[in-house]
């Protein structure tokens, strides 16, 4: 059967999850698959992220409609009513067209029945296999039977068949018979052998006796065809290439016509090369003859297990998002110089993350290989990046910040050690801190004591004087050779396309770029080469989390736009809001249902006694034992039994409480009762873990159920807040590239958009750019957008206009736009601020005085319009970071180095012999832009690094500018007599103070509009319902601005789609009479949900923003803040219930 | 402070127009594929960190390359540092941009008048040219034969495992033709024995020749193309004369 989804998301790392949540949030059904057996991708291995130095993944969870999704740590797992998650699943093929794709998925079996696995770990204990643990980056071993990640919920063991040695010890050890190696099915696995040589059949029959496979043969080609036509039961065909009566090709193709999934194994001599061609036609494998029994039998047996237990799933989907992530460069190939794999003190950055993690490899920690504490730790950047020899003419973009973060983590971890924090040293070339908050992060790291040395390392060797350490030589900043020893040397490994990229690209029918990452289209950063297939996260190039999420939103937006064409979101009927009865005035009547078929319940629990004890509790009106609560029949039984007693509280004792969240909604509808008055309590784990004899299990289970009853008895039965209707209109402020992109994206979803631009013309800063680094024409693109916006039936453009008034809250804002034709009132559900930035103004150093001094952008324009005559030039100088990354403006403007490289290439194209000198601090050509920096150097342009405390000096003489700077490589000054000097002025925010105040959003310390959370909510402003993108948010190039605009549009659509905005059941409230207005709760709220009222006499809670985390209640000195659903009395009574003597 | 500024008496490098053509740099750019990648330098310092000659004459490979890139090739080539390079190729081996610094050094050496090149290297090259053995130490054919036979006798007598060891000189048709650095027969003859033992253990069919056996080639280090060629030709002829299949050079 084929399931139908709106979208298929391939890859369940943070980007895939984000895309899936985006789409699910607008009511779309999503299939989310991942090839690994766990969610979360690489992030499950990283405890902390830069620049926040914490995790925060949960901030991706929906803020409204919270009940549709799980509401716990996302490192543990995710449930969402619109998302079906398929793990250990790969995309095999993708046929069809946008709007009607047909995908074939293969789900690898784990051989462990999740409904029976109790996570006891006995299988892993007995497994004799030792392979490198993926979770701990190979620093420890795992068995074939193993737990993929320690923290997942639910968490089941899996058997990795590829490494299994088929000893079946785990099968015998499993106490709940959860492991299934398909022993019973072997006898019906008919193998047909079509081989003229009777010896083959005879051998196979003998060899496979123990496996009990029925072997039939030898048969000739005609009888194979007959059997296939008759539909006789053949589970596997072994087809020899020397078959003569019918050609093997014919047999194969005919068999596959009749049964496309028939597994066929080809055998033949090595010379029978045509077999390779047949493989492509659908045979599973080619095995060389003579068959080697020792290899063939286990191989065939594993193949059998795969065939009978792998699941082929076919789905239809309108759009596809690929979020395959990236992998880390393996430095084994440079073991001879960098010592990785030879000196145990040399580790990769991922391995270091595991070493400092609390779930890291046992007995390792931050130690030298000889067990002594590691006190001197160094990082080496660009291992496998920025290296032509390793075919990596790109920058991996994230490693500089990762190493700085790791240095911070190490210093914090060792702060209490004798002698203070460990010494941390980072060896690098450029420090690529191009993200908005990164420069300050670097400054802090320097201030806290991490040493930064500008040198790549040639070789890392064991220290002859101290065998536990390694030794390196390097040039210090003064150019003097130094020798130094370190306890651990961390290789900052670069990014590579994900493992299995080629297979995925082939299956999805997409092209890759020259570095093997997914190729994307100009000005469409999330679009792949195949229409309807989008790229999220770092699948199209290395990115940090923040940018990956932006790309995930942009990809989701692309998918959503497409889905919307076939099944318009606006016309979809929302699920009717269930109406629950008000039980405020009723006496509590608790119904307790306990699942009696969880694996160990029967043997370890005295269910009669348990029922008796529960019935005796005050407030409990009914108790029922239910068989297999996890099945729909079991669930129906719960509903029936509950109806009999008409409860107003329900407790269910079962396994995996999180999995029951959607079920509670069903129950709520059936009983007309708010699911907030229901609780699921895990009794399965208790019965499983209660010691070998099960002693104490009864009272443990009873105690746990009693706690749940106490919790519900104390629950606030008042109905939750009424949902607010949302207005299906968006307001976009700013008509530049970002604003236009966002407006069109929202309007394509059928929502009305008001696009407001201050100036008389749309287009913004992008109209000044002649050419992108890739050679594309931005003006043409922006003109196209202007044209599309002008013609779009859903867009109203207001130029020469300003927003004059803005009131209201998310879902229902009211703004007034002052236009030349008078004020226009706009009622809207969401707003996107794309109010742009400006090129910084320069006044000093001859700018505007000397004609030969100009900004990089002016140089580009003048090269384009011919007002600079390159033929008359003798030398050109450029100075980067002219106004960026200093105290006044402590951020990298990102675009200036790209601009410089672009100008260098153009100058050198016209005059190859012209000396061009670029004075820089760090060249920030991150990602694939590094390639253009390489090309710029190839032309012979010279790049000279300067230090901010010793910037280049300038003197104007005879129409020339003499730029003089200290070259740290030569150790002496370089003097360039330049006819032309270009200064990188940088990006500054436009004046946002008015708009920020009006919209109630905050600005950051630089004057850009501030993100709600840089990492996890990158396009949300600090006010719910208002989104930010483009230069208004921070420096960005065009592709990045477009992606952000699409991300902001995606968030806006998500909001507009909600016909009603409802808060979660658990939100905080303030008892104003007890509140002393101390403001502590405002400081600790991680969601900015609290503020002081405009009248300054009340703390207000935005219940849409409040996520019920309880931080406010914890810090409130007067108990003035309470968390609905967690009152003091309720929590204390739960504790009492836990501690009460068992009678 | 990011960069310690060093006091330097050296005058600034002045750039006021396109660099002069026809120099060292152009030669490299013309002759090597991709110009030896000369321009691609990231100034990462990896070469200098791995170079045994770094620091000598206040020079290192990165600085040398930078001087050339900035058009100061005469100054670079004149530096006596060019004679400290051992041509070990550690720099190009690990350089992320595969920049051919050793080739650059070679050309720089070539730009020196022959009689100003270091006496030691020049003398060794000249010596090698003078004797058919190509020995930089002037070891003559008969000296070599004598030393080998003398040491062989000694080894046979003193070491049981070597009682039946055979060494051939000028044996035609042997599979391997073995070269030997002349430092060993001239000053440390015992040092030849370990290799003999290895070759015996693996059952190698090899021979010495009394001419063209000296493995070292100082003419290469001298950047004297003609002399280098003469030396190599003489050795090749020796190999071919004996009809050996492989020429095993231990340098």
For each predicted feature, which ranges?
Chain B
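Ferredoxin-type iron-sulfur electron-transfer modules and their immediate structural context
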Residues: 1-84
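Iron-sulfur-cluster electron-transfer modules
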Residues: 38, 55, 68-249
């Amino acid at each position: 059967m084929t399931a139908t989804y709106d979208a298929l998301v391939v890859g369940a790392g943070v980007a895939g999850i984000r895309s899936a949540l985006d789409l699910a949030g607008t009511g779309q059904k999503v299939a989310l698959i991942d090839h690994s057996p766990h969610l979360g991708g690489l992030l499950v291995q990283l405890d902390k992220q830069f620049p926040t130095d914490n995790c925060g993944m949960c901030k991706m969870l929906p803020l409204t409609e919270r009940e549709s999704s799980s509401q716990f740590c996302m490192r543990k797992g995710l449930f969402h009513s619109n998302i079906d998650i398929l793990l250990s699943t790969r995309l095999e093929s993708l046929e069809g067209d946008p709007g009607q794709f047909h995908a074939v998925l293969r789900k690898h079996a784990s051989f462990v029945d999740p409904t029976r696995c109790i996570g006891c770990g006995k299988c892993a204990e007995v497994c004799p296999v030792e392979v490198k643990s993926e979770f701990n980056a190979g620093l420890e071993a795992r068995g074939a039977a193993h737990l993929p990640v320690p923290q997942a919920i639910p968490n089941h063991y899996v058997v990795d068949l590829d490494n299994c040695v088929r000893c079946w010890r785990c099968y015998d050890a499993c106490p709940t018979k959860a492991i299934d190696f398909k022993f019973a099915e072997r006898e019906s696995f008919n193998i047909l052998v079509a081989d003229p040589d009777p010896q083959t059949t005879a051998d196979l029959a003998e060899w496979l006796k123990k496996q009990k496979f029925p072997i039939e043969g030898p048969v000739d080609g005609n009888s194979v065809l007959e059997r296939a036509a008759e539909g006789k039961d053949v589970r596997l065909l072994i087809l020899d290439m020397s078959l003569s009566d019918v050609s093997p090709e014919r047999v194969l193709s005919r068999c596959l016509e009749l049964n496309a999934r028939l597994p066929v194994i080809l055998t033949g001599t090595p010379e029978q090369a045509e077999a390779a061609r047949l493989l492509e036609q659908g045979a599973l494998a080619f095995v060389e003859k003579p068959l080697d029994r020792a290899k063939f039998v286990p191989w065939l047996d594993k193949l059998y297990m795969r065939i009978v237990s792998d699941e082929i799933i076919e789905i239809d989907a309108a759009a596809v998002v690929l979020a395959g992530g990236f992998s880390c460069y393996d430095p084994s190939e440079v073991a001879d110089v960098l010592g990785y794999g030879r000196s145990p003190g040399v580790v990769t950055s991922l391995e270091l993350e595991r070493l400092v993690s609390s779930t890291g490899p046992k007995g390792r920690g931050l130690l030298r290989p000889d067990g002594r504490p590691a006190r001197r730790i160094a990082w080496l950047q660009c291992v496998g990046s920025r290296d032509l020899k390793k075919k990596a003419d790109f920058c991996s973009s994230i490693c500089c910040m990762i190493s700085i973060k790791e240095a911070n983590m190490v210093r914090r971890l060792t702060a209490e050690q004798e002698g203070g924090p460990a010494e941390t040293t980072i060896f690098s070339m450029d420090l690529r801190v191009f993200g908005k908050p990164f420069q300050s992060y670097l400054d802090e790291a320097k201030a806290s004591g991490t040493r930064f040395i500008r040198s790549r390392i040639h070789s890392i060797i064991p220290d002859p004087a101290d065998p536990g350490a390694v030794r390196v030589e390097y040039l210090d900043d003064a150019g003097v050779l130094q020798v130094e020893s370190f306890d651990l040397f961390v290789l900052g490994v670069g990014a590579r396309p994900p493992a299995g990229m080629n297979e995925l690209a082939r299956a999805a029918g997409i092209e890759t770029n020259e570095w093997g990452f997914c190729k994307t289209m100009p000005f469409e950063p999330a679009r792949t080469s195949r229409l309807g297939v989008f790229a999220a996260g770092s699948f199209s190039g290395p990115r940090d989390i923040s940018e990956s999420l932006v790309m995930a939103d942009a990809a989701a937006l692309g998918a959503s736009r497409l889905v919307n064409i076939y099944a318009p979101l606006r016309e979809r009927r929302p699920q009717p809001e269930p109406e629950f009865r008000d039980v405020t005035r009723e006496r509590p009547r608790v119904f307790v249902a306990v699942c009696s078929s969880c694996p160990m319940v029967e043997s370890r629990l005295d269910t009669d006694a348990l029922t008796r004890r529960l019935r005796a509790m005050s407030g409990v009106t009914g108790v029922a034992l239910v068989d297999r609560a996890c099945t729909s029949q079991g669930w129906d039984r719960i509903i029936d039994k509950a109806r009999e007693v008409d409860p107003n509280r329900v407790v269910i004792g079962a396994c995996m409480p999180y999995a029951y969240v959607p079920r509670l909604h069903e129950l709520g509808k059936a009983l007309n009762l708010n699911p907030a008055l229901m609780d699921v309590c895990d009794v399965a784990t208790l019965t499983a873990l209660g010691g070998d004899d099960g002693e104490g299990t009864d009272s443990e289970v009873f105690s746990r159920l009693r706690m749940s009853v106490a919790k519900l008895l104390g629950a606030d039965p008042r109905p939750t807040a009424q949902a607010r209707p949302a207005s299906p209109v968006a307001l976009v402020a700013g008509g530049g590239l970002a604003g236009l992109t966002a407006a069109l994206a929202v309007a394509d979803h059928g929502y009305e958009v008001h696009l407001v631009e201050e100036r008389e013309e749309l287009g913004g800063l992008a109209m000044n750019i002649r050419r992108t680094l890739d050679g594309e024409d931005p003006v043409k693109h922006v003109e196209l957008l202007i044209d599309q916006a002008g013609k779009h039936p859903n867009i109203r453009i207001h130029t020469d206009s300003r927003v004059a008034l803005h009131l209201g809250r998310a879902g229902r804002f009211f703004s007034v736009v002052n236009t030349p034709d008078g004020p226009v009132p706009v009622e809207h559900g969401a707003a996107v601020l794309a109010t742009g930035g400006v090129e910084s103004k320069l006044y000093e150093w001859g700018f505007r005085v000397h004609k030969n001094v100009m900004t990089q952008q002016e140089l580009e324009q003048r090269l384009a319009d011919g007002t600079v005559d390159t033929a008359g030039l003798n030398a050109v100088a450029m100075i980067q970071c002219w106004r960026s990354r200093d105290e006044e403006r402590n951020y990298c403007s990102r675009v200036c180095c790209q601009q410089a490289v672009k100008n260098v290439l153009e100058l050198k194209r016209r005059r190859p012999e012209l000396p061009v000198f670029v004075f820089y601090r760090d060249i920030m050509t991150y990602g694939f832009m590094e390639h253009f920096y390489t090309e710029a150097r190839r032309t012979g342009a010279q790049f000279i690094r300067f230090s901010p405390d010793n910037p280049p000096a300038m003197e104007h003489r005879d129409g020339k500018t003499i730029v003089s700077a200290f070259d740290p490589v030569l150790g002496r000054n370089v003097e360039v007599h330049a006819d032309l000097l270009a200064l990188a002025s940088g990006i500054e925010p436009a004046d946002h103070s008015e708009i920020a105040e009006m919209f109630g959003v905050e600005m950051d310390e630089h004057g850009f509009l501030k993100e709600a959370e840089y990492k996890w909510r990158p396009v949300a402003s600090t006010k719910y319902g208002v989104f930010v993108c483009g230069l208004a948010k921070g420096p960005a190039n065009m592709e990045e601005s477009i992606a952000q605009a699409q991300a902001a549009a995606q968030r806006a659509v998500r909001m507009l789609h909600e016909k009603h905005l409802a808060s979660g059941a658990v939100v905080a409230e303030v008892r104003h009479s007890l509140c002393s207005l101390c403001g502590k709760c405002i400081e600790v709220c991680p969601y900015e949900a609290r503020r002081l009222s405009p009248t300054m006499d009340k703390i207000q809670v935005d219940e849409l923003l409040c996520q019920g985390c309880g931080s406010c209640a914890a810090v409130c000195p007067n108990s003035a803040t309470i968390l609905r659903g967690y009152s003091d009395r309720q929590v204390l009574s739960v504790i009492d219930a836990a501690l009460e003597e068992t009678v | 402070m990011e960069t310690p500024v060093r006091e330097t008496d050296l005058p600034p490098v002045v750039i006021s127009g396109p660099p002069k053509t026809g120099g060292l740099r152009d030669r490299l750019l013309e002759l090597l594929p991709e110009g030896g990648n000369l321009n691609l330098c990231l100034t990462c310092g990896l070469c200098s960190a791995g170079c045994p000659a770094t620091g000598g004459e206040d020079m290192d490979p990165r600085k040398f390359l930078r001087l050339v890139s900035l058009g100061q090739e005469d100054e670079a080539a004149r530096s006596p540092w060019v004679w400290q390079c051992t041509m070990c190729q550690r720099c190009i081996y690990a350089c992320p941009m595969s920049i051919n610094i050793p080739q650059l050094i070679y050309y720089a050496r070539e730009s020196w008048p022959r009689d100003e090149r270091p006496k030691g290297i020049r003398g060794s090259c000249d010596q090698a040219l003078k004797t058919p053995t190509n020995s930089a130490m002037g070891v003559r054919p008969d000296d070599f034969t004598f030393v080998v036979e003398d040491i062989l006798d000694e080894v046979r007598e003193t070491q049981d495992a070597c009682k039946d060891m055979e060494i051939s000189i000028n044996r035609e048709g042997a599979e391997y033709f073995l070269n030997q650095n002349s430092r060993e027969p001239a000053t440390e003859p015992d040092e030849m024995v370990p290799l003999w033992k290895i070759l015996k253990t693996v059952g190698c069919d090899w021979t010495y020749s009394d001419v063209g056996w000296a493995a070292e080639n100082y003419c290469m280090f001298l950047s004297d193309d003609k002399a280098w060629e003469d030396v190599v030709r003489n050795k090749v002829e020796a190999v071919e004369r004996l009809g050996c299949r492989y020429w095993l050079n231990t340098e």
